[in-house]
């Protein structure tokens, strides 16, 4: 239902990636209108956001050698994530290998796929790897990536320490709400796009989230601000 309604609402694209003023009218059954109001107010659980955080953590775990592939897979997008080579055929490494395949395939972050990716994250055991317990060389590798992508992977206005950020990813609290009129809950984004980040530069041959959003949603911030419902 959501997908069809939003396709109709977004049929007229406005070529302006920053701020747009829109007036939308919806008609439908009471249950449909109630769902649209929940979307407009942000009262929707953003499963894609959890899948994104888990994906970033798995990406870093592979880059730092905490997790290794169990098959001969070469990541053309980011060779560093498989640089540690093949590892033991353990449940954790098998889960990582399956997750990496989904990253390479650019899986859509719809509800079903987000739940599947969450199961792989749980099986990988990454959430149990607290910062204080990581080897020094692993922490150094993670810190290098974090420093380069801080603005994309956490609050751009914040000054969160890498250790606090990593442990927050381990805690993996699922947000109860999202931004008003969050289009990413309606027209799903992709795992590789979100790991690559708004400014890109992490994965070779993958668009930045900025370019993906402006092409797919018509704006670079696909959510609502200052809504009157």
Name the predicted role of every residue range.
Residues 14-229:
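Long, contiguous binding/interaction regions
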Residues 1-15:
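Short, Lys/Arg-enriched N-terminal segments with co-localized hydrophobic residues
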């Amino acid at each position: 239902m959501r997908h069809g309604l939003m396709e109709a609402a977004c049929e007229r694209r406005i070529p302006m990636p920053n701020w747009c003023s829109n007036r939308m009218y919806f008609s439908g059954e009471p249950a449909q209108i109630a769902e649209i109001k929940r979307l407009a107010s942000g009262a929707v659980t953003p499963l894609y956001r959890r899948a994104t955080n888990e994906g970033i953590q798995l990406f870093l775990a592979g880059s730092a050698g905490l997790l290794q592939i169990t098959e001969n897979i070469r990541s053309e997008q980011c060779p560093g994530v498989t640089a540690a080579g093949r590892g033991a055929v353990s449940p954790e490494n098998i889960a990582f290998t399956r997750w990496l395949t989904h990253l390479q395939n650019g899986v859509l972050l719809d509800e079903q796929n987000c739940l599947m990716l969450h199961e792989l994250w749980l099986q990988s055991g990454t959430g149990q790897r607290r910062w204080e317990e990581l080897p020094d060389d692993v922490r150094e590798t993670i810190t290098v990536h974090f420093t380069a992508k801080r603005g994309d992977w956490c609050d751009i206005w914040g000054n969160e320490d890498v250790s606090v950020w990593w442990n927050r990813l381990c805690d993996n609290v699922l947000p109860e709400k999202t931004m008003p009129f969050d289009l990413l809950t309606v027209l799903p984004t992709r795992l590789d796009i979100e790991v690559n980040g708004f400014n890109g530069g992490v994965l070779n041959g993958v668009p930045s989230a900025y370019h993906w959003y402006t092409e797919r949603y018509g704006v670079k911030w696909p959510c609502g601000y200052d809504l009157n419902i």
